[in-house]
Every structure is written in structure tokens, then in C-alpha cells.
Amino acid sequence: MEPNPIFSEFQLEFFKRIKMQPKSIETLNDVSEVMSGCAQIFSFENLDVVANTTEPLNREVIIQQLVNNKQGGLCYKINSVFYYFIKSFGFNIYQVRCCVENQETHDCWQINGAHIINIIEYENKKYLADVAFGCNLSYEPIPFSEEIIESCTGLYRIRKVDNIIRDIKYTYLLEFKKPDSFSPESARLWTNGYAFDPLVKAIDIDENDKIDSHATQIQQLIIDDPTKEFSVKPLATKVVNNESIATLTSNSFTLTNCKTGEKTKVTFDINNEIKQLEQFNQHLISIFNLPPLKFLPKI
């Protein structure tokens, strides 16, 4: 890749958004720096879905929302804006859709194809670059070699698998775990994240940027999901100061130490709707730098 000292408006705005000095993105170390910036800036949140303010998505809309309007989003927005940015520097990067294991019960798989990731081909090797798997973030590309990548949020690896999900041909599995200092002990065991096939590319992104069908399709899958996991209950989560994970729900705010698992929790007054909304918005603004909600949905 040739050095590119002249940056596009989008590139400059993206650098500004993730608080990174403009530079030519040429190596995996450069990509890691971008991933680190994304992890610390973009909130993984579903507030537009909950508030029923979603719109059809394309490159222009996603950039407007996440870069210019300083919003967060779910995987189909955050991973897509990262994809646009890295691709603009000439990287061989493409997207793949995955199936996520239920991260609460770990006893079932969720909607097939409802998570989207980035695959980078660099020096004849493939790497996974996911900046939007909740706060399970590697901060650097993960090689397809079972090499363990460690970040402040945990340890990550990719394993080749067969028949991980019945009747669906997936060939690789992302696994993660917490460090040995983390409590509870069960979190220190390797856990399934999601299954995918790196050869099945999400290639039908409209070249004229009229519609990014994969982002729009996944958004609709989330809205139509009968379990309503991401469509009814407001959620915002992000890494704070590379040491804690902040999680905001309609009922509480929790700060979890990445190394120990120690939690500090603030419970909202659910018996007083006005006060509950005030408490929610206070944290939404101060921790996540997101605009306040007008109401909290009744669940």
C-alpha cells in the first residue's frame, strides 16, 4: 500500500472522532491503533431501535450517524463504519455474517446471520477485526491460527471447527475468556462467541451507496426478533479508560473492572418513572456522551 498523506474528509473526520492523529494506515499495527480508538469511543447501544427511530442504512447514513452525529450503534453500524475507513486506505477487507451464541445462558445459538464482522487479508493471511461484539473487544486483529490475543477486556482466539451449529456450515469459531484474576471463576473458561465461515462474503453492498443491504437486513432481524433481546430493553455499553466496562440498562448502571470482575452498581428508582428516566439520562450523557431519551419503554 502506497503512503497516502492526503486524507479525504471522511478519513479526517473519522480520525477526529476516535481521537487519533491522522496518519496513513498501512500495517496491522496501524489497524490495531484504529481498533483501540473505536473501542474507547463508540458505544455499543440499541437506542434507535428501542425508540423506533431506525432508518434504511447505507454508507452515507452510517457515517452521518456514527462520525458526524457522534452516535453509537450495534455491530452492523460500528463494524461497517470501521470497514469503510480501513477500506479507504486500500486494505483487502470484507465483511462476513455470523451466528452468536447466547451470551447469558450459553445453551443455544441466536439468530443466524445477525452479527457482522470484518475479515482483513494481509500478507497472505486472514485476520478477524471486530470492533462491535459488545465489549468483548480484542483491540487488534485476531489471526486464524489459534494464537491468543489479549486486551484489557480479555483473551481471544479463533479455532477451526466442524458442525458447530446443526444444519449450518460454519468453519470457524471465535472464543474468549477473562484473565485468571477475574471473578467469577466460570468467566476464566473459554467461551463460544460466534461461529462463521470466512469464505462466505457479504458482498452485495450497493456500489452506489444507495443501500447497504446487510446492515439494513441485520437491523430488521433485530427489530423482528421474537425474543426482543435488543429491540425493547435499552442498552448501552462501552470500555472506560481501558480498565472498566460501563453498562447502562433502564434499571441500573454497572461498572465492571476488567481485571477482577468487581462490580459497582447504581440501581435506579423503578417506582418513580420520572426519576428513573432522569437517572438513566444522567448516565447516558455523562458516561456515553449520548443524547437523552424522551421516555423509557415499559417492559
Curated annotation (Swiss-Prot):
The active site is at C75, H115, D130. The keyword Acyltransferase applies. Pfam families: Acetyltransf_2 (PF00797). It comes from the Eukaryota. The keyword Acyltransferase applies. Signal peptide: none annotated. Its EC number is 2.3.1.5. Keywords: Acyltransferase, Transferase. SUPFAM superfamilies: Cysteine proteinases. It is an enzyme of class 2 (transferase). GO terms for molecular function: arylamine N-acetyltransferase activity. Gene3D superfamilies: 3.30.2140.20. It catalyses: an arylamine + acetyl-CoA = an N-acetylarylamine + CoA. PANTHER family: ARYLAMINE N-ACETYLTRANSFERASE 1-RELATED, N-HYDROXYARYLAMINE O-ACETYLTRANSFERASE. Belongs to the arylamine N-acetyltransferase family. This is Probable arylamine N-acetyltransferase 2. It comes from Dictyostelium discoideum (Social amoeba).
